[in-house]
Amino acid sequence: MQKIKVLCVDDSALIRSLMTEIINGQPDMTVVATAPDPLVARELIKQHNPDVLTLDVEMPRMDGLDFLEKLMRLRPMPVVMVSSLTERGNEITLRALELGAVDFVTKPKVGIRDGMLDYSEKLADKIRAAARARVRQSAPVQHAAAHAAHAPVGAAPLFNNPLLSTEKLIIVGASTGGTEAIREVLVPLPPDAPAVLIAQHMPPGFTKSFAQRLNGLCRITVKEAEHGERVLPGHAYIAPGHAHLLLARSGANYIAHLSDEPPVNRHRPSVDVLFRSAAQHAGKNAVGVILTGMGRDGAAGLLDMKKAGAYTLAQDEASCIVFGMPREAIALGAADEIASLPEMSRRVMARLSSMGDRVQRV
Protein backbone atom coordinates (compact mmCIF):
# COMPACT_ATOMS: atom_id res chain seq x y z
CA MET A 1 0.00 0.00 0.00
CA GLN A 2 1.36 3.39 -1.01
CA LYS A 3 1.34 5.76 1.94
CA ILE A 4 0.01 9.31 1.85
CA LYS A 5 3.00 11.66 1.74
CA VAL A 6 2.62 14.61 4.12
CA LEU A 7 4.65 17.81 4.43
CA CYS A 8 4.21 19.63 7.77
CA VAL A 9 4.81 23.39 7.84
CA ASP A 10 4.93 25.08 11.26
CA ASP A 11 7.28 27.59 12.86
CA SER A 12 7.28 25.62 16.14
CA ALA A 13 9.79 22.75 16.22
CA LEU A 14 7.76 21.17 19.03
CA ILE A 15 4.55 21.20 16.99
CA ARG A 16 6.38 19.83 13.94
CA SER A 17 7.74 16.99 16.07
CA LEU A 18 4.35 16.21 17.60
CA MET A 19 2.57 16.28 14.24
CA THR A 20 5.24 14.00 12.78
CA GLU A 21 4.83 11.54 15.65
CA ILE A 22 1.05 11.45 15.18
CA ILE A 23 1.14 11.09 11.39
CA ASN A 24 3.92 8.50 11.32
CA GLY A 25 1.93 6.49 13.86
CA GLN A 26 -0.74 5.89 11.21
CA PRO A 27 -0.36 2.84 8.95
CA ASP A 28 -1.31 4.65 5.74
CA MET A 29 0.61 7.94 5.90
CA THR A 30 4.10 9.29 6.47
CA VAL A 31 5.76 12.68 6.94
CA VAL A 32 8.24 13.10 4.08
CA ALA A 33 9.56 16.44 5.36
CA THR A 34 8.89 19.34 7.72
CA ALA A 35 9.46 23.06 7.24
CA PRO A 36 9.68 25.99 9.69
CA ASP A 37 8.22 28.50 7.22
CA PRO A 38 6.64 28.75 3.74
CA LEU A 39 9.87 29.69 1.98
CA VAL A 40 11.52 26.43 3.03
CA ALA A 41 8.27 24.58 2.30
CA ARG A 42 8.28 25.88 -1.27
CA GLU A 43 11.56 24.10 -1.97
CA LEU A 44 10.51 20.92 -0.14
CA ILE A 45 7.33 20.71 -2.22
CA LYS A 46 9.47 20.62 -5.36
CA GLN A 47 11.72 17.91 -3.87
CA HIS A 48 9.14 15.59 -2.31
CA ASN A 49 5.90 16.22 -4.24
CA PRO A 50 3.72 15.59 -1.14
CA ASP A 51 0.12 14.43 -1.37
CA VAL A 52 -1.04 16.67 1.49
CA LEU A 53 0.34 19.79 3.15
CA THR A 54 -0.42 20.73 6.76
CA LEU A 55 0.07 24.48 7.08
CA ASP A 56 0.30 26.67 10.17
CA VAL A 57 -1.95 29.70 9.89
CA GLU A 58 0.45 32.29 11.33
CA MET A 59 4.18 32.11 10.59
CA PRO A 60 7.21 34.39 10.15
CA ARG A 61 8.86 35.33 6.83
CA MET A 62 5.68 34.72 4.85
CA ASP A 63 2.12 34.72 6.15
CA GLY A 64 0.31 31.39 5.84
CA LEU A 65 -2.54 32.99 3.86
CA ASP A 66 -0.16 34.66 1.40
CA PHE A 67 1.59 31.36 0.84
CA LEU A 68 -1.69 29.47 0.46
CA GLU A 69 -3.00 31.99 -2.08
CA LYS A 70 0.16 31.67 -4.19
CA LEU A 71 0.20 27.88 -3.82
CA MET A 72 -3.42 27.44 -4.94
CA ARG A 73 -2.82 29.69 -7.92
CA LEU A 74 0.48 28.20 -9.09
CA ARG A 75 0.46 24.61 -7.82
CA PRO A 76 -2.91 23.60 -6.34
CA MET A 77 -2.64 20.77 -3.81
CA PRO A 78 -4.61 19.50 -0.79
CA VAL A 79 -3.93 21.67 2.26
CA VAL A 80 -5.09 21.15 5.86
CA MET A 81 -4.70 24.33 7.90
CA VAL A 82 -3.49 24.11 11.50
CA SER A 83 -5.02 26.89 13.59
CA SER A 84 -4.89 28.27 17.11
CA LEU A 85 -8.14 28.69 19.04
CA THR A 86 -8.23 32.48 18.93
CA GLU A 87 -10.66 34.91 17.33
CA ARG A 88 -7.95 36.06 14.92
CA GLY A 89 -7.00 32.44 14.20
CA ASN A 90 -10.65 31.63 13.46
CA GLU A 91 -10.97 34.46 10.95
CA ILE A 92 -7.74 33.53 9.19
CA THR A 93 -8.78 29.88 9.02
CA LEU A 94 -12.12 30.73 7.42
CA ARG A 95 -10.31 32.92 4.90
CA ALA A 96 -7.96 29.99 4.17
CA LEU A 97 -10.95 27.77 3.38
CA GLU A 98 -12.19 30.43 0.96
CA LEU A 99 -8.76 30.40 -0.70
CA GLY A 100 -8.96 26.65 -1.32
CA ALA A 101 -7.73 24.82 1.79
CA VAL A 102 -9.58 21.50 2.11
CA ASP A 103 -10.03 21.52 5.89
CA PHE A 104 -8.51 22.66 9.15
CA VAL A 105 -7.55 21.27 12.53
CA THR A 106 -6.70 23.00 15.79
CA LYS A 107 -3.13 22.87 17.07
CA PRO A 108 -2.31 19.93 19.35
CA LYS A 109 -1.95 20.83 23.02
CA VAL A 110 1.69 20.30 23.85
CA GLY A 111 2.32 18.33 27.05
CA ILE A 112 -1.32 17.30 27.49
CA ARG A 113 -1.87 13.61 26.79
CA ASP A 114 -5.58 13.61 27.66
CA GLY A 115 -7.55 13.68 24.43
CA MET A 116 -4.48 13.06 22.28
CA LEU A 117 -5.86 9.79 20.88
CA ASP A 118 -9.04 11.56 19.76
CA TYR A 119 -6.98 14.40 18.29
CA SER A 120 -4.74 11.93 16.44
CA GLU A 121 -7.77 10.20 14.90
CA LYS A 122 -9.28 13.51 13.79
CA LEU A 123 -6.02 14.70 12.25
CA ALA A 124 -5.52 11.40 10.41
CA ASP A 125 -9.12 11.46 9.12
CA LYS A 126 -8.68 14.99 7.79
CA ILE A 127 -5.43 14.07 6.03
CA ARG A 128 -7.08 11.01 4.45
CA ALA A 129 -10.00 13.14 3.28
CA ALA A 130 -7.62 15.78 1.91
CA ALA A 131 -5.65 13.17 -0.02
CA ARG A 132 -8.87 12.18 -1.82
CA ALA A 133 -10.23 15.70 -2.21
CA ARG A 134 -10.82 17.59 -5.43
CA VAL A 135 -8.56 20.59 -5.12
CA ARG A 136 -10.03 23.81 -6.41
CA GLN A 137 -8.45 27.16 -7.08
CA SER A 138 -9.80 30.00 -5.02
CA ALA A 139 -12.78 31.91 -6.38
CA PRO A 140 -13.83 35.45 -5.45
CA VAL A 141 -16.24 35.56 -2.53
CA GLN A 142 -19.58 36.82 -3.82
CA HIS A 143 -21.90 38.84 -1.61
CA ALA A 144 -25.67 38.64 -1.81
CA ALA A 145 -25.84 42.10 -3.41
CA ALA A 146 -23.38 41.05 -6.09
CA HIS A 147 -25.36 37.88 -6.70
CA ALA A 148 -28.54 39.90 -7.23
CA ALA A 149 -26.76 42.50 -9.37
CA HIS A 150 -25.41 39.88 -11.76
CA ALA A 151 -28.71 38.05 -12.27
CA PRO A 152 -29.81 38.08 -15.93
CA VAL A 153 -32.26 40.86 -16.79
CA GLY A 154 -35.77 39.49 -16.60
CA ALA A 155 -34.65 36.33 -14.83
CA ALA A 156 -37.17 34.78 -12.47
CA PRO A 157 -36.29 35.24 -8.79
CA LEU A 158 -35.25 32.20 -6.85
CA PHE A 159 -38.47 32.37 -4.91
CA ASN A 160 -41.58 33.90 -6.49
CA ASN A 161 -44.19 33.38 -3.77
CA PRO A 162 -43.11 34.54 -0.30
CA LEU A 163 -43.79 31.88 2.29
CA LEU A 164 -46.21 33.29 4.82
CA SER A 165 -45.96 30.22 7.02
CA THR A 166 -43.13 29.50 9.42
CA GLU A 167 -43.77 25.82 8.83
CA LYS A 168 -41.34 25.35 5.92
CA LEU A 169 -37.70 24.59 6.75
CA ILE A 170 -34.40 23.95 5.00
CA ILE A 171 -32.17 21.45 6.84
CA VAL A 172 -28.50 21.24 5.79
CA GLY A 173 -25.62 18.93 6.76
CA ALA A 174 -21.97 19.07 5.67
CA SER A 175 -18.41 18.20 6.65
CA THR A 176 -15.12 18.48 4.71
CA GLY A 177 -15.44 21.32 2.19
CA GLY A 178 -18.74 22.31 3.75
CA THR A 179 -17.91 25.86 4.81
CA GLU A 180 -17.65 27.03 1.22
CA ALA A 181 -20.51 24.80 0.05
CA ILE A 182 -22.79 26.26 2.73
CA ARG A 183 -21.82 29.77 1.69
CA GLU A 184 -22.74 28.98 -1.90
CA VAL A 185 -26.12 27.64 -0.79
CA LEU A 186 -26.97 30.52 1.56
CA VAL A 187 -25.81 33.61 -0.35
CA PRO A 188 -28.47 33.37 -3.10
CA LEU A 189 -31.35 32.87 -0.65
CA PRO A 190 -33.88 35.73 -0.57
CA PRO A 191 -34.70 37.56 2.67
CA ASP A 192 -38.07 35.78 2.86
CA ALA A 193 -36.57 32.29 2.64
CA PRO A 194 -37.70 29.70 5.19
CA ALA A 195 -35.52 29.13 8.23
CA VAL A 196 -32.36 27.11 7.65
CA LEU A 197 -30.84 24.77 10.26
CA ILE A 198 -27.25 23.69 9.64
CA ALA A 199 -24.98 21.02 11.10
CA GLN A 200 -21.40 21.50 9.90
CA HIS A 201 -18.60 19.43 11.44
CA MET A 202 -16.51 22.12 13.11
CA PRO A 203 -14.77 22.37 16.50
CA PRO A 204 -15.88 24.74 19.28
CA GLY A 205 -14.81 28.33 18.80
CA PHE A 206 -15.08 28.37 15.02
CA THR A 207 -18.83 28.17 14.46
CA LYS A 208 -19.54 31.65 15.85
CA SER A 209 -16.92 33.21 13.57
CA PHE A 210 -18.27 31.15 10.67
CA ALA A 211 -21.81 32.42 11.31
CA GLN A 212 -20.65 36.03 11.60
CA ARG A 213 -18.73 35.76 8.35
CA LEU A 214 -21.76 34.34 6.51
CA ASN A 215 -24.02 36.98 8.05
CA GLY A 216 -21.96 39.65 6.32
CA LEU A 217 -22.41 37.95 2.95
CA CYS A 218 -26.08 36.88 2.99
CA ARG A 219 -29.46 38.58 2.70
CA ILE A 220 -30.80 36.32 5.42
CA THR A 221 -29.59 36.59 9.03
CA VAL A 222 -27.01 33.93 9.90
CA LYS A 223 -26.18 33.15 13.53
CA GLU A 224 -24.92 30.45 15.84
CA ALA A 225 -27.93 28.58 17.25
CA GLU A 226 -28.90 29.21 20.87
CA HIS A 227 -30.78 26.76 23.06
CA GLY A 228 -34.51 27.42 23.23
CA GLU A 229 -34.67 30.22 20.66
CA ARG A 230 -37.54 30.36 18.20
CA VAL A 231 -36.67 29.34 14.64
CA LEU A 232 -37.74 32.16 12.31
CA PRO A 233 -37.99 32.63 8.54
CA GLY A 234 -35.19 34.64 6.98
CA HIS A 235 -32.69 33.19 9.46
CA ALA A 236 -30.05 30.46 9.31
CA TYR A 237 -28.97 28.71 12.51
CA ILE A 238 -25.58 26.99 12.69
CA ALA A 239 -24.98 24.27 15.26
CA PRO A 240 -22.32 25.31 17.81
CA GLY A 241 -19.13 23.30 17.62
CA HIS A 242 -19.70 21.79 21.06
CA ALA A 243 -23.32 20.64 20.75
CA HIS A 244 -25.85 18.73 18.70
CA LEU A 245 -28.53 20.91 17.11
CA LEU A 246 -32.06 19.48 17.10
CA LEU A 247 -35.36 20.81 15.86
CA ALA A 248 -38.13 20.87 18.47
CA ARG A 249 -41.65 22.23 18.70
CA SER A 250 -43.40 24.50 21.18
CA GLY A 251 -47.03 24.65 20.13
CA ALA A 252 -47.12 25.92 16.55
CA ASN A 253 -43.55 27.22 16.70
CA TYR A 254 -40.25 25.58 15.85
CA ILE A 255 -37.55 25.81 18.52
CA ALA A 256 -33.78 25.21 18.39
CA HIS A 257 -32.64 22.66 20.95
CA LEU A 258 -28.98 22.11 21.84
CA SER A 259 -27.75 18.86 23.37
CA ASP A 260 -24.44 17.81 24.92
CA GLU A 261 -25.21 14.12 24.40
CA PRO A 262 -22.20 12.03 23.27
CA PRO A 263 -20.94 12.32 19.67
CA VAL A 264 -22.85 10.40 17.00
CA ASN A 265 -20.80 8.96 14.13
CA ARG A 266 -17.84 10.45 16.06
CA HIS A 267 -19.25 13.94 15.58
CA ARG A 268 -20.89 16.57 17.73
CA PRO A 269 -22.66 18.33 16.13
CA SER A 270 -23.93 15.36 14.11
CA VAL A 271 -25.85 15.71 10.86
CA ASP A 272 -27.83 12.54 11.61
CA VAL A 273 -29.06 14.02 14.90
CA LEU A 274 -30.33 17.17 13.17
CA PHE A 275 -31.90 15.31 10.25
CA ARG A 276 -33.71 12.84 12.51
CA SER A 277 -35.17 15.62 14.64
CA ALA A 278 -36.38 17.33 11.46
CA ALA A 279 -37.98 14.08 10.30
CA GLN A 280 -39.82 13.86 13.61
CA HIS A 281 -40.98 17.46 13.95
CA ALA A 282 -41.14 18.91 10.43
CA GLY A 283 -41.95 15.90 8.24
CA LYS A 284 -43.10 16.93 4.76
CA ASN A 285 -42.69 20.63 5.58
CA ALA A 286 -38.89 20.35 5.29
CA VAL A 287 -36.33 20.11 2.51
CA GLY A 288 -33.16 18.21 3.47
CA VAL A 289 -29.77 18.86 1.86
CA ILE A 290 -26.60 16.81 2.34
CA LEU A 291 -23.40 18.43 1.09
CA THR A 292 -19.74 17.53 0.65
CA GLY A 293 -18.03 15.61 3.45
CA MET A 294 -16.14 12.49 4.45
CA GLY A 295 -17.87 9.52 6.05
CA ARG A 296 -21.54 8.62 6.39
CA ASP A 297 -22.92 11.08 8.95
CA GLY A 298 -26.29 12.31 7.73
CA ALA A 299 -27.03 9.52 5.25
CA ALA A 300 -29.37 7.57 7.55
CA GLY A 301 -30.92 10.78 8.87
CA LEU A 302 -31.66 12.00 5.35
CA LEU A 303 -33.41 8.70 4.66
CA ASP A 304 -35.51 9.26 7.80
CA MET A 305 -36.45 12.70 6.48
CA LYS A 306 -37.44 11.23 3.11
CA LYS A 307 -39.56 8.55 4.79
CA ALA A 308 -41.27 11.29 6.82
CA GLY A 309 -42.25 13.05 3.59
CA ALA A 310 -39.48 15.63 3.24
CA TYR A 311 -37.94 16.36 -0.15
CA THR A 312 -34.24 15.50 -0.07
CA LEU A 313 -31.24 16.56 -2.16
CA ALA A 314 -27.62 15.39 -2.29
CA GLN A 315 -24.69 17.26 -3.79
CA ASP A 316 -23.30 15.63 -6.92
CA GLU A 317 -19.85 14.07 -7.09
CA ALA A 318 -18.43 16.55 -9.59
CA SER A 319 -18.95 19.57 -7.30
CA CYS A 320 -17.99 17.89 -3.99
CA ILE A 321 -14.61 18.43 -2.35
CA VAL A 322 -15.07 14.98 -0.78
CA PHE A 323 -17.87 12.78 -2.13
CA GLY A 324 -18.44 10.77 1.03
CA MET A 325 -21.61 11.75 2.87
CA PRO A 326 -23.62 12.41 -0.32
CA ARG A 327 -22.41 9.11 -1.80
CA GLU A 328 -23.62 7.21 1.27
CA ALA A 329 -26.98 8.99 1.18
CA ILE A 330 -27.44 8.23 -2.51
CA ALA A 331 -26.48 4.58 -1.95
CA LEU A 332 -29.19 4.32 0.75
CA GLY A 333 -31.78 5.75 -1.61
CA ALA A 334 -32.14 8.76 0.67
CA ALA A 335 -31.90 11.44 -2.03
CA ASP A 336 -34.90 12.43 -4.15
CA GLU A 337 -32.61 14.56 -6.29
CA ILE A 338 -28.89 14.93 -6.99
CA ALA A 339 -27.83 18.50 -7.75
CA SER A 340 -24.61 20.37 -8.44
CA LEU A 341 -23.55 22.94 -5.86
CA PRO A 342 -24.11 25.96 -8.16
CA GLU A 343 -27.71 24.81 -8.70
CA MET A 344 -28.49 23.73 -5.14
CA SER A 345 -30.13 26.96 -3.90
CA ARG A 346 -32.29 27.25 -6.99
CA ARG A 347 -33.42 23.62 -6.72
CA VAL A 348 -34.23 23.99 -3.02
CA MET A 349 -36.22 27.18 -3.52
CA ALA A 350 -38.00 25.80 -6.58
CA ARG A 351 -39.16 22.87 -4.49
CA LEU A 352 -40.30 25.14 -1.65
CA SER A 353 -42.08 27.40 -4.12
CA SER A 354 -44.00 24.41 -5.45
CA MET A 355 -45.11 23.71 -1.87
CA GLY A 356 -46.64 27.20 -1.81
CA ASP A 357 -48.07 28.77 1.30
CA ARG A 358 -50.05 25.73 2.35
CA VAL A 359 -49.29 24.77 5.93
CA GLN A 360 -48.87 21.02 6.10
CA ARG A 361 -49.41 19.81 9.65
CA VAL A 362 -47.26 16.93 10.78
Curated annotation (Swiss-Prot):
It is found in: Cytoplasm. Its main location: cytoplasm. Residues 163-355 form the CheB-type methylesterase domain. GO terms for molecular function: phosphorelay response regulator activity; protein-glutamate methylesterase activity; protein-glutamine glutaminase activity. CDD domains: CheB_Rec (cd16432), REC_CheB-like (cd17541). The active site is at residues 175, 201, 297. The modification 4-aspartylphosphate is found at residue 56. It catalyses: [protein]-L-glutamate 5-O-methyl ester + H2O = L-glutamyl-[protein] + methanol + H(+); L-glutaminyl-[protein] + H2O = L-glutamyl-[protein] + NH4(+). Keywords: Chemotaxis, Cytoplasm, Hydrolase, Phosphoprotein. One of its GO terms (cellular component) is cytoplasm. It is an enzyme of class 3 (hydrolase). Residues 5-122 form the Response regulatory domain. GO terms for biological process: chemotaxis. Pfam families: CheB_methylest, Response_reg. Phosphorylated by CheA. Phosphorylation of the N-terminal regulatory domain activates the methylesterase activity. Its EC number is 3.1.1.61, 3.5.1.44. SMART domains: REC (SM00448). NCBIfam families: PRK00742.1, PRK12555.1. Belongs to the CheB family. Contains a C-terminal catalytic domain, and an N-terminal region which modulates catalytic activity. Involved in chemotaxis. Part of a chemotaxis signal transduction system that modulates chemotaxis in response to various stimuli. Catalyzes the demethylation of specific methylglutamate residues introduced into the chemoreceptors (methyl-accepting chemotaxis proteins or MCP) by CheR. Also mediates the irreversible deamidation of specific glutamine residues to glutamic acid. This is Protein-glutamate methylesterase/protein-glutamine glutaminase.
